Amino acid sequence: MNPNPKARPMRLLIVDDSNMIRSRISRVVQNGGLANVSLVGLARNGAEAVRIARATQPEVVTMDLTMPEMDGVQCIGELLRLLPKINILVVSALSDKSTAIAALKLGARGFVAKPFSDDDLRMALLDVMEAR
């Protein structure tokens, strides 16, 4: 399958309470061969993510689970109600199997445990983007 070079870039929202993690994910997206991705927002918590998602209609979201105001679990539910076709990749330090399974049952399409390598994140993002 040849991607259409004129196709609209896939909109990505990065959600994490750590500025360092938001910056790292952004860097991987911008420098890691994910050419057809447009970063539409950076959110520090779930409540901010919902506000940004309403305005930007992202197709893919990277989501931390442990955040202030609204955690990732609540945010996944809100985003799926708002945008039922959204694809969510959980990126979390809560790396036990039960956490990953719970996130997937909520509707996330993938899970990457922190700390992660750039390659692991890139591959997980590609998998989630292909699922759309």
Predicted regions located by residue number:
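A Lys-centered signature of the CheY-like receiver
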Residues: 17, 114
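Two-component/phosphorelay signaling modules centered on CheY-like receiver
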Residues: 19-41
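Acidic catalytic/metal-coordinating carboxylates
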Residues: 45-48, 71-74
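Active-site beta3 strand of CheY-like receiver
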Residues: 56-62
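Active-site residues of response regulator receiver
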Residues: 64, 92
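Receiver (REC) domain active-site loop signature in two-component systems and cognate sites
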Residues: 67
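C-terminal output helix
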Residues: 116-125
